[in-house]
Amino acid sequence: MRSEMLTALLTLAVLLQVAGSLKIAAFNIRSFGETKMSNATLTSYIVRILQRYDIALIQEVRDSHLTAVGKLLDKLNEKAADTYRFVASEPLGRRTYKERYLFVYRPDQVSVLDSYYYDDGCEPCGTDTFSREPAVVRFSSPSTKVREFAIVPLHSAPEDAVAEIDALYDVYLDVQKKWGLQDVMLMGDFNADYSYVTSSQWSSIRLRTNPAFKWLIPDTADTTATSTNCAYDRIVVAGPLLQDAVVPNSAAPFNFQAAYGLSNQLAQAISDHYPVEVTLA
């Protein structure tokens, strides 16, 4: 009897732990738009990957009228309506080339409380900081240790990666000032490796040198689906509640090629990046 009771309690504890977890990812889906969504094979794998997550930040969204985004949400909600919702930025970029930041999320797990664009200066004057300024989103997460947190997205311009990653420190301070919020996740394709950020340049990046920020994806990680071995994509967390909520060893790239047994050609057709993911308890 005692053995059965202990087993039942352990099972309940496991269920509660799973129920109270939140899986978050940042995924640069190369040139995500109508062409990619018109390919049934690529679409099926993209949907399969995104269904792993409660919140997913998608970058490199080339979709002027949100047509591809609409098709993606239709696929994500195919089995049950309103399984996923989305928040999309306006097209961002200094010249004719523009991208959106796209968040897809499960409304049964989190809700969007607010969002805003970080003001990084005068774009027409050429004095702005970011090629694609962060569109910051504030989430409520009632089932995790941290009940509210913000996500700051960044897909940096490779040639400006050092300056843009460093400027995320200023974005964090701005989020604190605007919302009085310490718990912030900064993530995306930072281009934080190779010749874009060299080992000697890390000391000039405040987001790296300030101990308030915890980098979850190490420099040794490979976040690319190509033959390169680079840690371009990162997740950084700040704030005591958010840092405490991170499940140990849960932050990593998700190698979908290995997980699904894909050829190099098919994997790279999906994207040249792997998602980077983390679980909150």
Curated annotation (Swiss-Prot):
Keyword entries, A-Z: Actin-binding, Apoptosis, Calcium, Cytoplasmic vesicle, Disulfide bond, Endonuclease, Glycoprotein, Hydrolase, Nuclease, Nucleus, Secreted, Signal
Tissue expression as described in the entry: Equivalent levels in pancreas and parotid gland, low amounts in kidney, liver, small intestine, stomach and thymus.
Family annotation (PANTHER family): DEOXYRIBONUCLEASE, DEOXYRIBONUCLEASE-1
Cofactor note: Divalent metal cations. Prefers Ca(2+) or Mg(2+).
Subcellular location: Secreted; Zymogen granule; Nucleus envelope
Cofactor list: Ca(2+); Mg(2+)
Reactions accelerated catalytically: Endonucleolytic cleavage to 5'-phosphodinucleotide and 5'-phosphooligonucleotide end-products
Species this protein is from: Oryctolagus cuniculus
Protein name per the record: Deoxyribonuclease-1
Source species, domain of life: Eukaryota
Site positions for Involved in actin-binding: E34
